[in-house]
Each structure stands twice: as structure tokens, then as C-alpha cells.
């Protein structure tokens, strides 16, 4: 799974772009995440899908957070909930989120 998150450093006020599979110690600073975009294979294993999660200032105070989403398959009339654990790495910070 490929994940990119947008957020803001709650200490410095700078916006940041975060990517997955990181070893950065997130306990050193707190980040408020407000958007996550990721690519994954859907639950029936056929299609690569892109999903965007709109977050409301999730406090990232450790190395991950859990999100449960409902995935709907075209061949089924019901959804399935899957818990994801996202792990992030700070790539860089910018002054203005409009620079994304």
C-alpha cells in the first residue's frame, strides 16, 4: 500500500507531506493530519483503487493511527470494514499548504 498524508506540524505551524513505511520517531513532534491519499488493492483483490480520506485534525502522537473504512465491491451488495494501520514518515515541510 502506498500512502501519502498531508498535515501540519502543530508546534511550528508548517504544513507537511508524509509518506508511509517510515522509521521517523513521531513522538518527537505532534502532527495534525487532514488528508490521506493512498493506493491499494480492493478487498476482492481485483482492482487497484485510489482512495482519499478526509481527516479532521487527527493527532499523530505515535507512529501510527488506525482507520476503519467500508469498502464496497461492485459484485456484492454489502460492504466490509477493514482496519488499516498507517505508518508515516516526514518527507518535508512547507510554509503554505497551497504549495502542494
Regions found by a protein language model. Name each.
Residues 36-100:
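Short, mixed-charge low-complexity intrinsically disordered segments
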Amino acid at each position: 500500500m502506498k500512502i501519502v498524508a498531508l498535515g501540519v506540524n502543530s508546534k511550528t505551524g508548517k504544513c507537511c507531506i508524509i509518506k508511509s513505511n517510515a522509521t521517523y520517531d513521531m513522538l518527537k513532534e505532534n502532527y495534525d493530519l487532514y488528508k490521506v491519499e493512498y493506493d491499494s488493492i480492493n478487498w476482492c483483490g481485483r482492482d487497484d483503487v485510489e482512495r482519499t480520506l478526509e481527516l479532521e485534525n487527527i493527532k499523530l502522537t505515535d507512529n501510527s493511527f488506525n482507520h476503519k473504512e467500508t469498502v464496497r465491491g461492485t459484485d456484492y451488495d454489502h460492504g466490509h470494514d477493514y482496519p488499516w494501520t498507517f505508518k508515516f514518515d516526514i518527507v518535508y515541510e512547507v510554509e503554505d499548504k497551497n504549495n502542494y
